[in-house]
């Protein structure tokens, strides 16, 4: 099964977890990266394809937002915004990227802190769409190891397959 969206490294997780290693990246996308785009400066982020930023041990704990009936994680949100700032400084344009999360409260928290052209939305709301860069905020971090929406394989497949050139996943390992 040939896919035409994402770099081979981004595709690898989804192929292994959901498609029994049946996905193949077309030659036109398998090696593409942010550094192929003019005026993007090489950095540790822009030179990568798939990054997992583990927040275990940071004290970034989820909280319940009663107003939105949803979860949020302030520390993780600050980290995602810092990562976005690093990408923007390296020349990544806001309309090339999106910040997504399974949780509406986290989406709201992020949306209030980014430039207007940087899209912020839920995983479900982003289904069928793609961007050059996706920053995925997983939110869940608690002492009992509860993962909530993260156990929904369909949602996680959608979340992990929206990026074309760079996927940054931020969460508690």
State where each predicted segment sits.
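Residue-level signature of catalytic and energy-coupling elements of molecular machines
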Residues: 10, 80, 99, 128, ...
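Conserved motor-coupling elements within RecA-like helicase/translocase cores
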Residues: 111-145, 150
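Flexible loop/turn segments at secondary-structure boundaries
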Residues: 6-9, 59-61, 105-109, 127, ...
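Proline-centered turn/helix-capping motifs that create local helix->coil transitions or kinks
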Residues: 18-25
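Generic beta-strand/beta-sheet core signal
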Residues: 26, 53-55, 100-102, 121-123, ...
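C-terminal accessory regions
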Residues: 1-6, 13, 19, 83, ...
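Conserved helicase/translocase motor-coupling segment
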Residues: 25-112
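Beta-sheet entry/capping signal
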Residues: 96-98, 132-133, 166-168
């Amino acid at each position: 099964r040939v896919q035409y969206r994402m770099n081979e490294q981004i595709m690898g997780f989804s192929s292994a977890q959901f498609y029994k290693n049946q996905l193949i990246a077309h030659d036109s996308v398998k090696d593409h990266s942010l550094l192929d785009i003019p005026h993007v400066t090489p950095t540790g982020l822009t030179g990568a394809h798939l990054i997992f930023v583990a927040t275990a041990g940071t004290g970034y704990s989820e909280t319940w937002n009663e107003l939105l009936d949803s979860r949020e994680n302030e520390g993780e949100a600050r980290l995602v915004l810092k990562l976005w700032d690093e990408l923007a400084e390296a020349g990544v344009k806001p309309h090339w990227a999106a910040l997504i999360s399974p949780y509406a409260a986290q989406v709201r928290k992020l949306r209030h802190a980014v430039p207007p052209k940087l899209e912020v939305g839920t995983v479900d709301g982003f289904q069928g769409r793609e961007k050059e860069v996706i920053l995925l905020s997983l939110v869940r971090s608690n002492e009992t190891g509860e993962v909530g929406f993260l156990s929904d394989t369909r949602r996680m497949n959608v979340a992990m397959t929206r990026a074309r050139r760079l996927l940054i996943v931020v969460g508690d390992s």
